[in-house]
C-alpha cells in the first residue's frame, strides 16, 4: 500500500450521500432529480484539485499530493461501489496502472478493474453500467475494465495489460481475489519473457522520440528520461521480487539508497512539471510544449531573467529538466541491465552465459562488455577510470557491466584538479580522443556517468543547456557528442556517398584528435554571456597546452574553436559568387590546413545542430566555397581567380556537359548566342548543371529562345530536386523583366503553400528575367500531382501577364512560432561593383513572409536583383540585392522609408498574419 496520510494537506471533505437516495435519484427519469443526485461531487472534485494546487504553493511535497489525490478517489469509488450495491456481489474493485501505484496527478487517467471469479450476471451488469454512467457524469472519465478471471488470463497476454495488473491494488470487494491479478501475470509471463518484451517496448518508445532525452518539446511521461523509464524498473523487478513499492528494491539489495534517492528526486521533479501541465491545460497533458514552458518555469521559481537575456529563466528550467531526464534514463538503463545480469543471466545454461576473458590485471571482457576485475579497481588505481575507456576502444567493446558502472559513478566524483593535473591522466585522456573506435559511445558513457563533466568542468556547465529556439535541436553536450559521432562517420564507407569530399579530406588528416578537441570546445562557453567562440578559444588553448600538446596544435584547436561559424555564415549569408567575398574569406582562413580542418568541422557541426539543416543546397554552397578558397590558397595558376575567370570556367564546364549529353534539340551556335544574351551575372550565380537545364528549356520555347520577342509568353519549368530536401522542387522562370516580378512570384508561391529555400534573381542583357527558385512543398503533392504542377505554372504565367498588386493570403502563425520574439532588424550595405544595396533582413519566420516583403518592395518601387533565403529554426535571415526601378542606388531617405515600411509590415503578430 501507499501512504494515505492527507492530514497536512487540508482537503475539502467529501459531500455526504447515502446509497438509498443516490440510487433512487440516479435511476429517475427526471433530469433535475439526476443532477441533484450528484450531490455536488463534480464541484467537490474541482475543489480537491484546487486544494492540491494551493498545497503545492505552500510547499507541500508533490509526492504527498499525488498520493492524496489517489486517496480521495479511493474513498469516492469505495462509497459509490457501496451505493450501487456492488459490495453485496462477488466483484472486486481494483485500482490499476499509475492509480494502482497511488499516483494521480490532477487529470491523470483513473484506471480501474472490476474483477469477478465468473461471468457477470445481468443484474450485476446493470449495476456496473449505472456506476460507470455516474462516474462519467461527475467528470471522472475512468478507464474501466470489467473482466472475469478467465477473461483476465487471456487479456494478460498483452504486456501492457500485464503491466497494469502488476500495479493492481484492491480497493473494496471480494478479498479472495486480492492477489489474483499478480498471480495471473506470474502465470502468463516468465521473468525472461516479460523482461524481453518490456525492453523491446522501451526501445520502440525511444525511437518514437528520436532516441534522445533532448527533444525541444519532450513528453515527460513517455520520452527517454520520462516517468515511463522509472515505471519500467518497477515492472521488470516487481514481477520477480514480488514487491509493491520501489523502495522495497532497496531492502532486496537490488537498488542502493543513493539510487533510490536520485530516482525519487527526479520523479518528484517530473511530477511537479506534470502537475502544472495539467493545471494549465485542464487535461491529461504530458507534452511540455513551448506553449507552457515559460509559464511553468515561472511557476517553479525560475524567474531570473534580464532584458538582454529574456530566455534565461526558461533555459535554466529546461536545462534542469534535461539533466533530470538524463539521470532517469541512465539509471533506468543501468538498473534494467543490472536485472538482466544478476537475475536473467543466472538462470541461463552455462553455455549461454557470457564468457570472461582477462584484459589486464584491472579489467576483464565479459561477453561484449568490459568489467573491473575486482571492486577496488578505481579506488586503488584512479587512472583506471580513463584507462577503461581506452581499452574499450582498443578492444572494440561498446558496453560496460553494471557493477562497474556503479563503481565508475562513485569514482568520477573524485576527479578533482589534482587528478586533472596528473600527467598520466592527461596522457590517457588524449589517448582516448586519438582512439577512434567507438569514440562517440565512450564519450557518451563518460558524460552520463560524470567522468567528462568532472574532467572538463566547463563541459559540466553546458550539460543539459538548450537554447530556447527552433534551430538548435539538442543540448550543447548532446550536440557536441553528435558532432564527434558524425566526424567518425566520415571514415565509414557506408556514409561516403553522403559526404564524398568531406570524407576524403577527413581521412587524409593525420591528427584527427585536433578536430575532436575543436568539437569538444567549440560551444563550451555558451550560456555565460559574451562571445562564446572567443571564450572557447581561450579555454581550448589552455587545455591543449596543459595536456602537453605543441603550441602549433593548441593554436589550431583554438583557431577552429574561434572561427567554427565562419564558413557556414559566409556560405549561407554572403554572395560567394563574388570573387572579393571568397578572397576575403581566404585571407581569414590563411592556409589549406586551416581550410581542410574548418570545412570538415563545419559540415559535421551543421549536421549535428539540426537534422533538417543539412541538404544538398547547403552542401553545394559549402563545397563551392571550399573549392574556390582552396584554389586561392594554393595559388593554382589554372584556377579562376577573378570575376571573368570564374565566368569563363563556368561556361567551359557547361559546354563540356553539353557535349556529353543528347543535345540534338540544341544547336551549339544557338546556345552560344543565347549565353551571350544572358549576361555575366548569370554565369557567376548558376552552376553548370542548371545552366544546361535552363538552356534546353529556353531553346525549346521558340518565341523566347529563338526570337527574343518582347511579347512572347513567359517560360516556367519545374523539376524534382529530392537531393536537396524531401518534396523540394526547382522552378525556373524566363520572362520579360518587370518591376513587380518578385512580389507577384512570392505571392503565387505563398498562395500554393510553397516555402522558398533559395532564390536567384538575375536580369539578362535584353531585360529578361532569369529567376531560379528552390521550393519546399508543404502539402507534399506538387511532385506527384501533374494538376498541381500545371496550376503553379499557369498561376505564374497569368500573374506575369497581368502584373497587378499581388493579393496576400492570411494564414495562422504555426503554434511553435508564436512563442518566440525575434526582433526585425534590417541593415544596408552598398556594393560599389554592382551599384546596388545589399539589404540583410532578420525576422521571425512566418507564413507569407517573402510575399509581404515583396509587397513592400512593390509599394516602395524597389527592384530586386538577387536574393539569398535562409531559414534557421524560427529565424529568417534573408539578403536582397536591390536598387530603384532605374537600376540606380537608393538614397538615404529612401532606405529609411523602406526600412520603416518593412518593420511595420513584419511586426504584425496576431493569430493570423
From Swiss-Prot:
Any single GO BP term: regulation of nitrogen utilization
Cofactor: Mg(2+)
Activity regulation field: Uridylyltransferase (UTase) activity is inhibited by glutamine, while glutamine activates uridylyl-removing (UR) activity.
Region of interest (Uridylyltransferase), residue spans: 1-358
Top-level taxon in the UniProt lineage: Bacteria
EC number: 2.7.7.59, 3.1.4.-
Domain comment, as recorded: Has four distinct domains: an N-terminal nucleotidyltransferase (NT) domain responsible for UTase activity, a central HD domain that encodes UR activity, and two C-terminal ACT domains that seem to have a role in glutamine sensing.
Identification of the protein by name: Bifunctional uridylyltransferase/uridylyl-removing enzyme
Amino acid at each position: 500500500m501507499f501512504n494515505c496520510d492527507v492530514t497536512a494537506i487540508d482537503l475539502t471533505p467529501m459531500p455526504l450521500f447515502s446509497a438509498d437516495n443516490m440510487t433512487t435519484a440516479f435511476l429517475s427519469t427526471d433530469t433535475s432529480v439526476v443532477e441533484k443526485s450528484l450531490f455536488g461531487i463534480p464541484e467537490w472534485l474541482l475543489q480537491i484539485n484546487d486544494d492540491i494546487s494551493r498545497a503545492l504553493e505552500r510547499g507541500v511535497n508533490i509526492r504527498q499530493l499525488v498520493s492524496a489525490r489517489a486517496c480521495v478517489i479511493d474513498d469516492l469509488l469505495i462509497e459509490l461501489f457501496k451505493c450501487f450495491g456492488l459490495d453485496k456481489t462477488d466483484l472486486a474493485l481494483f485500482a490499476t496502472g499509475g492509480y494502482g501505484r497511488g499516483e494521480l496527478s490532477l487529470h491523470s487517467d483513473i484506471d480501474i478493474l472490476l474483477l469477478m471469479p465468473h461471468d457477470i450476471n445481468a443484474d450485476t451488469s446493470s449495476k456496473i453500467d449505472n456506476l460507470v454512467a455516474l462516474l462519467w457524469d461527475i467528470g471522472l472519465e475512468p478507464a474501466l475494465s470489467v473482466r472475469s478471471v478467465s477473461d483476465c488470463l487471456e487479456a494478460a497476454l498483452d504486456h501492457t495489460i500485464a503491466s497494469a495488473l502488476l500495479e493492481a491494488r484492491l480497493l473494496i470487494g471480494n478479498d479472495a481475489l486480492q492477489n489474483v491479478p499478480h498471480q495471473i501475470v506470474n502465470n502468463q509471463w516468465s521473468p525472461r519473457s516479460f523482461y524481453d518484451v518490456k525492453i523491446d517496448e522501451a526501445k520502440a518508445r525511444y525511437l518514437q522520440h528520436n532516441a534522445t532525452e533532448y527533444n525541444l518539446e519532450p513528453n515527460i511521461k513517455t520520452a527517454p528520461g520520462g516517468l515511463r523509464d522509472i515505471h519500467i524498473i518497477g515492472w521488470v523487478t516487481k514481477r520477480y521480487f514480488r514487491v509493491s513499492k520501489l523502495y522495497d528494491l532497496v531492502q532486496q539489495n537490488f537498488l542502493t539508497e543513493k539510487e533510490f534517492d536520485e530516482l525519487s528526486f527526479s520523479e518528484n521533479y517530473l511530477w511537479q512539471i506534470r502537475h502544472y501541465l495539467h493545471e494549465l491545460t485542464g487535461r491529461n497533458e504530458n507534452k511540455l510544449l513551448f506553449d507552457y514552458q515559460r509559464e511553468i518555469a515561472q511557476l517553479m521559481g525560475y524567474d531570473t531573467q534580464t532584458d538582454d537575456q529574456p530566455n534565461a529563466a526558461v533555459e535554466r528550467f529546461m536545462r534542469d529538466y534535461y539533466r533530470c531526464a538524463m539521470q532517469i534514463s541512465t539509471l533506468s538503463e543501468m538498473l534494467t541491465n543490472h536485472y538482466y545480469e544478476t537475475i536473467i543471466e543466472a538462470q541461463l545454461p552455462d553455455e549461454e552465459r557470457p564468457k570472461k576473458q582477462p584484459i589486464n590485471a584491472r579489467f576483464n571482457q565479459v561477453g561484449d562488455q568490459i568489467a573491473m576485475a575486482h571492486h577496488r579497481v578505481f579506488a586503488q588505481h584512479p587512472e583506471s577510470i580513463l584507462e577503461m575507456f581506452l581499452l574499450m576502444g582498443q578492444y572494440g567493446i561498446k558496453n560496460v557491466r553494471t557493477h562497474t558502472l556503479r563503481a565508475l559513478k562513485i569514482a568520477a566524483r573524485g576527479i578533482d584538479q589534482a587528478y586533472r593535473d596528473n600527467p598520466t591522466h592527461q596522457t590517457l585522456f588524449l589517448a582516448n580522443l586519438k582512439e577512434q573506435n567507438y569514440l562517440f559511445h565512450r564519450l557518451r558513457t563518460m558524460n552520463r556517468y560524470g567522468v567528462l563533466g568532472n574532467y572538463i568542468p566547463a563541459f559540466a556547465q553546458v550539460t543539459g543547456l538548450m537554447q530556447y529556439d527552433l534551430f538548435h535541436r539538442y543540448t550543447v553536450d548532446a550536440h557536441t557528442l553528435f558532432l564527434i559521432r558524425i566526424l567518425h562517420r566520415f571514415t565509414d564507407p557506408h556514409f561516403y556517398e553522403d559526404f564524398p569530399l568531406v570524407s576524403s579530406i577527413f581521412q587524409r588528416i593525420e591528427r584527427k584528435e585536433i578536430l575532436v578537441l575543436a568539437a569538444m570546445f567549440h560551444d563550451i562557453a555558451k550560456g555565460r554571456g559574451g562571445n562564446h567562440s572567443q571564450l572557447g578559444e581561450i579555454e581550448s588553448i589552455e587545455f591543449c597546452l596543459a595536456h602537453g600538446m605543441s603550441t602549433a596544435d593548441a593554436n589550431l584547436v583554438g583557431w577552429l574553436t574561434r572561427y567554427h561559424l565562419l564558413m557556414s555564415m559566409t556560405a549561407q549569408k554572403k554572395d560567394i559568387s563574388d570573387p572579393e567575398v571568397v578572397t576575403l574569406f581566404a585571407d581569414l582562413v590563411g592556409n589549406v590546413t586551416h581550410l581542410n580542418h574548418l570545412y570538415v568541422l563545419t559540415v559535421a557541426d551543421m549536421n549535428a545542430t539540426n537534422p533538417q539543416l543539412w541538404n544538398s543546397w547547403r552542401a553545394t554552397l559549402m563545397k563551392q566555397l571550399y573549392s574556390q578558397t582552396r584554389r586561392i590558397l594554393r595559388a593554382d595558376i589554372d584556377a579562376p581567380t577573378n570575376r571573368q575567370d570564374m565566368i569563363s570556367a563556368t561556361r567551359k564546364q557547361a559546354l563540356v556537359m553539353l557535349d556529353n549529353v543528347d543535345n540534338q534539340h540544341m544547336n551549339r551556335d544557338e546556345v552560344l548566342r543565347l549565353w551571350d544574351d544572358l549576361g555575366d551575372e548569370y554565369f557567376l550565380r548558376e552552376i553548370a548543371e542548371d545552366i544546361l537545364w535552363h538552356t534546353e528549356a529556353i531553346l525549346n520555347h521558340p518565341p523566347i529562345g529563338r526570337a527574343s520577342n518582347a511579347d512572347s509568353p513567359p517560360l516556367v519549368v519545374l523539376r524534382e530536386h529530392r537531393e536537396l530536401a524531401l518534396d523540394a522542387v526547382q522552378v525556373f522562370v524566363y520572362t520579360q523583366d518587370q518591376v513587380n516580378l518578385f512580389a507577384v512570384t512570392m505571392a503565387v508561391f505563398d498562395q500554393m503553400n510553397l516555402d522558398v529555400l533559395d532564390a536567384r534573381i538575375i536580369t539578362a542583357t535584353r531585360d529578361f528575367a532569369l529567376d531560379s527558385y528552390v521550393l519546399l512543398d508543404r502539402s507534399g503533392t506538387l511532385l506527384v500531382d501533374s494538376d498541381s504542377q500545371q496550376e503553379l505554372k499557369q498561376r505564374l504565367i497569368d500573374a506575369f501577364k497581368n502584373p497587378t498588386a499581388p493579393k496576400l493570403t492570411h494564414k495562422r502563425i504555426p503554434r511553435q512560432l508564436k512563442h518566440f520574439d525575434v526582433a526585425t532588424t534590417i541593415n544596408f550595405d552598398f556594393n560599389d561593383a554592382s551599384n546596388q544595396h545589399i539589404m540583410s533582413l532578420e525576422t521571425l519566420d512566418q507564413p507569407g513572409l517573402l510575399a509581404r516583403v515583396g509587397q513592400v518592395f512593390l509599394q516602395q518601387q524597389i527592384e530586386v536583383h538577387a536574393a539569398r533565403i535562409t531559414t534557421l529554426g524560427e529565424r529568417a535571415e534573408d539578403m536582397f540585392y536591390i536598387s530603384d526601378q532605374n537600376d540606380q542606388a537608393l538614397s538615404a531617405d529612401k532606405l529609411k522609408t523602406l526600412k520603416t515600411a518593412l518593420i511595420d509590415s513584419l511586426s504584425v503578430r496576431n493569430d493570423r498574419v
